[in-house]
Amino acid sequence: MPIVSWPELLEKLLSTKEISEIEAKALMKAWLNDELLPVQTGAFLTALRAKQISGLELSSMAEVLRDACLFPYPLPEVFMVDTCGTGGDGADTFNISTAVAFVTASCGVTIAKHGNRSASGKVGSADVLEGLGIKLNAPLELVVKAIEKNNITFLFAPAWHSSLINLAPLRKALGVRTVFNLLGPLVNPFRPKAQVLGVAKSELLDPMVEALRNLGLERAVVVHGAGGLDEASLEGPNEVRFLENGQITSKTLDVEELGLTISPNSTLKGGSLATNQDILRSLFQGRGTQSQREVVALNSSLVFWASGKELDLKKGVTIALEAMELSKPLDKFNELKCCLE
């Protein structure tokens, strides 16, 4: 017998009430164990989408997912940072957080980048990295070794979260974003102690930063970019939540105060896989457009803050721009590529 009544739990969600930690964990375990009918799963996913998700609901589900993750190795004993967005902003930008991962790693930050292919026909982090020569199906021991040897690695989500495979057809059939799009950034198998996470909607700022706090992160930045970007944006003021030692601070980030130029999000457009690959190659060598370089530097400054490397965001911007100018991200990319071969 389930520890909760599924009809009662569904009714609770449909009434837009917050479900408890026990209920959220029971629901996730039922999904992972294939205990619910497809129609029940569809109803729960729809009900969760229709209500305002809470930090407790997210962290409770994420804990179950992390525990179910395949990880037959000791966790790397280094202070790691993940950088990603939830997606769903519709802006079709190039792979900003992927570029940021290599820029910041080239400056000494240890990056555990957790990502996947795009489910929307766009170009996800895994798509662009594979196109550039990163081996997604590398033996998991090499993925672990890379972070110890090169201070950066890429964790291809399906290789670690095989328990979610049975849900993939239903999620695809629903055709809309679900709670799993929010959970993806929260379930990095390496359990980094710091993270920079972008959200496409401002109402997700507080639930996501609260979830990160519940999951035990020491430092984190959750950002909602101007113009609805799930990255820090050059278009205008960015809403930010900073998490440090359990304390959450809300701030508005003015890009001009950081020495950057206001630019519309349209200047950050990506395109085909080949286009996005070319943009990353250019940025890794200090080329690309001014807007492309500056948005990567802006988001890199948040990673530097989260890592503790540089708490002054303006100085962080300068560090990132100089790294690109010296082609340091390209060297770091080539190191990872060789390590995973």
Swiss-Prot record:
Q: Which residues bind anthranilate 1?
A: G85, N116
Q: Which UniProt keywords apply?
A: Amino-acid biosynthesis, Aromatic amino acid biosynthesis, Glycosyltransferase, Magnesium, Metal-binding, Transferase, Tryptophan biosynthesis
Catalyses which reaction? N-(5-phospho-beta-D-ribosyl)anthranilate + diphosphate = 5-phospho-alpha-D-ribose 1-diphosphate + anthranilate
What InterPro entries does the annotation carry?
Answer: Anthranilate_Pribosyl_Tfrase, Glycosyl_Trfase_fam3, Glycosyl_Trfase_fam3_N_dom, Glycosyl_Trfase_fam3_N_dom_sf, Nuc_phospho_transferase
Please tell me the species this chain comes from: Prochlorococcus marinus (strain SARG / CCMP1375 / SS120)
Residues where anthranilate 2 binds: R171
Q: Which function does this protein serve?
A: Catalyzes the transfer of the phosphoribosyl group of 5-phosphorylribose-1-pyrophosphate (PRPP) to anthranilate to yield N-(5'-phosphoribosyl)-anthranilate (PRA).
Q: In which pathway does it act?
A: Amino-acid biosynthesis; L-tryptophan biosynthesis; L-tryptophan from chorismate: step 2/5
Q: Record-annotated residues binding Mg(2+) 2?
A: D230, E231
Broadest EC class? transferase
This protein's name: Anthranilate phosphoribosyltransferase
Q: Does the keyword Glycosyltransferase apply?
A: yes
Note on how the cofactor is bound: Binds 2 magnesium ions per monomer.
- UniProt gene name: trpD
Q: Which GO terms describe its molecular function?
A: anthranilate phosphoribosyltransferase activity; magnesium ion binding
* Binding, Mg(2+) 1: S97, E231
User: Transmembrane stretches, by residue range?
Assistant: none
Subunit info?
Answer: Homodimer.
Superkingdom of the organism of origin: Bacteria
Q: Name one GO cellular component term.
A: cytosol
**Enzyme Commission code:** 2.4.2.18
Pfam families found in the cross-reference section: Glycos_trans_3N, Glycos_transf_3
Key word Endoplasmic reticulum present:
no
Residue positions annotated to bind 5-phospho-alpha-D-ribose 1-diphosphate are 85, 88-89, 93, 95-98, 113-121, 125
Q: Which GO terms describe its biological process?
A: L-tryptophan biosynthetic process
Q: Which residues form a coiled coil?
A: none
